[in-house]
Regions:
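Nucleic-acid enzyme cleavage-core boundary/entry regions
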Residues: 1-59, 69-71, 75-165
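Catalytic palm subdomain of template-directed nucleic-acid polymerases
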Residues: 65
Length: 165
């Protein structure tokens, strides 16, 4: 728990979560109350515990690697929560946008090769999780066999994202 705010932020992976937790704890006005990491597909098993938290959770924001697995996990989580009347799950769009900008800053505007070779062939329904403004760009990255990991987010990136949340 980092504040009394009613929003919950979930990262797919541990390293970006730990960096974000550090940034949020140092903030005088964190935009989210709780932060966690889902450990990939494990998030689907643990999300139901949100209902047991003392303070109510208004919204869950999810950010994962911009690859097919990361978006699939988010879309399945959103669907599961909607079907079971749990907190609403939204994309952490400001973080996704920053991941795209970070990849560009690092000289890889289309990301890096995805060794899993998973493309958007898994179904366009998965992309409905993403905000329309970035959906096509991310789909193009996937279709080219590339990905952008959460680990592109730096401490200063996160400070900027959280201050404009």
């Amino acid at each position: 728990r980092v504040s009394d705010a009613a929003d919950f932020l979930i990262f797919e992976n541990a390293a970006p979560y730990m960096l974000a937790r550090k940034v949020l704890r140092a903030s005088s006005n964190p935009p989210v109350g709780r932060i966690a990491y889902g450990s990939g597909h494990q998030v689907g098993k643990s999300i139901e515990y949100i209902a047991l938290l003392e303070a109510p959770v208004r919204n869950v924001f999810y950010v994962g690697d911009l690859d097919m697995r990361g978006i699939y996990i988010a879309a399945k989580l959103q669907s599961h929560c909607a079907a079971n009347d749990l907190a609403r799950v939204h994309p952490a769009t400001v973080l996704h946008e920053q991941m795209l900008a970070s990849a560009n800053r690092l000289g890889a505007p289309r990301g890096w090769p995805d060794q899993s070779r998973r493309t958007s062939a898994a179904g366009d329904w998965v992309f409905q999780f993403l905000e329309p403004a970035i959906r096509d760009e991310i789909k193009t990255i996937f279709d080219s066999g590339h990905r952008i990991p959460e680990e592109t987010l730096t401490e200063s990136d996160l400070i900027g994202c959280f201050s404009s949340w």
